Amino acid sequence: MQAAKDPQIAAIAVTELWHGVERATRTHKPRREAYLQMSVESLPILPYTGTTALEHARVWAALESSGKMIGFYDLIVAATALEHGDLVVTFNQRHFVQVPGLKVIEPK
């Protein structure tokens, strides 16, 4: 059995989370900002690199040629996970299970 890796997060996922904070109402924004800042500080952020870009292009082309497509940001998350040999933990399995070779689990 393979040992579990510590959680990591793709830079694009951090962008999506911060976008949610920026769209929050003035009432909710400070609390959400503090929570996200604390959460992000505890996780290594995986950058979008040249290798990620190549993996991104491969996944994009494979899905496109099979007539399937997922969101642009989801493609980047998938490519980042594949590049690092990681799995994706998401409530949105419907999109990610379409990516060949990507391991996907739903959190409990």
Where are the language model's segments positioned?
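C-terminal structural segments of small proteins and small subunits
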Residues: E83, L87-H95
